[in-house]
Amino acid sequence: MCIRDSCIKMSWITNYDAAQRELLMQKVQMQMSERRFRHVLGVEETAVALAAKYGADEAKASIAALTHDYAKERPNDEFELIIRRDGFDLALLNYGNEIWHGLVGADIVQRELAIDDEEILQAIRVHTTGAAKMSLLDKIIYVADYIEPGRDFPGVKEAREIALVDLDAAVAYETKHTLLHLIEQEHKIYPKTLETYNQWVVNQK
């Protein structure tokens, strides 16, 4: 299923211009609070800049960034229904929106916005947890979400500086500090986050 005028499929990529971006922004904005939308625009600004610096596809960076939190404000019962209905690992039910809005949210983006580009969808899936294997676009969205201009927390300035010179080091920095925060707050840690840590922090030494 797709929403009438969003059944554009791959033209999001092949014909992505200012008009297409505006249409996509409108669809995204309708799904979230103004505060969340400002964050999304900050992630897009950062992702496109990183894509330009590291030689990634800037259109894909824009689309992935604009849609990465598309499902963030959906109710938990909608996620639970999709997890049960669509064959996701039921262990996901032990977690919450912080995990679901990426891993499950990518399927919502695909269904409702007719975005079928697997590279974009994968970047949405792993933008919170990371992964042991990450494409250039995966890393860009993962880091951009962490360092966008609206973020304000101890260490974000250093993270931004690292991202300008070494994207892999920025992935490692983010992963390490996110894991430390989760441990300090005694939050449940999703296994893929540990896989990300082992690959990008431990194995990069």
Where are the regions that the model predicts?
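Short, small-residue-biased leader/transition segments that mark boundaries at the very start
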Residues: M1-I3
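A short, charge-rich alpha-helical start-of-domain segment used by transcription regulators
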Residues: E34-R38
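Generic N-terminal amphipathic, Lys/Arg-enriched alpha-helix
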Residues: M10-W12, Y16-M32
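Charged phosphate-binding loop/patch that engages nucleotide di/tri-phosphates or the phosphate backbone
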Residues: L180-K205
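Generic secondary-structure signature for well-ordered alpha-helical cores
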Residues: S33, A52, T129, L180-H187
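Divalent metal-dependent catalytic cores for phosphoryl transfer on phosphate-bearing substrates
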Residues: Q26-M30, V48, K53-T175
